[in-house]
Amino acid sequence: MTDLEFMDRAEKLLLAVEQSCDRINDTTDADLDGQRTGGMVTITFRNRSQIVINLQKPLHEIWMAAQSGGYHFRHDGTSWMDTKGAGEFFAALSHNATLQAGQALQFTD
């Protein structure tokens, strides 16, 4: 994948995360605060815990830091998959957000 392809796919992912935060706030009482700064999105939950998603352009990876740990994702041609086998990005984000929010939350691309 070229740098341009990575940035195109990665920007789409960050936009989808932002849009999911807006949708979740419109349809639940989760009260997520999603803040975008350059190539990073920080999601802050009501309990002040955070999930941070950021681009690692030199590695063509997206990193996610949650209370449960750190995750690295690479695009496999179809989806962003965890480099250590923990699954697809939006499934991992939904799982970690659910744990940190204390209620079921679904992030989608």
Swiss-Prot record:
GO molecular function, one term: ferric iron binding
InterPro entries membership: CyaY, Frataxin/CyaY, Frataxin/CyaY_sf, Frataxin_CS
Single GO cellular component term: cytoplasm
Pfam families: Frataxin_Cyay
Family: Belongs to the frataxin family.
Name of the featured protein: Iron-sulfur cluster assembly protein CyaY
Keywords on record: Iron, Metal-binding
Source organism of the structure: Acidovorax sp. (strain JS42)
Matches recorded under HAMAP family: CyaY
NCBIfam families: FeS_CyaY
Coiled-coil intervals, chain numbering: none
Function comment: Involved in iron-sulfur (Fe-S) cluster assembly. May act as a regulator of Fe-S biogenesis.
Any GO BP: iron-sulfur cluster assembly
Encoding gene (name): cyaY
Top-level taxonomic group: Bacteria
Disulfide bond annotation, renumbered to this chain: none
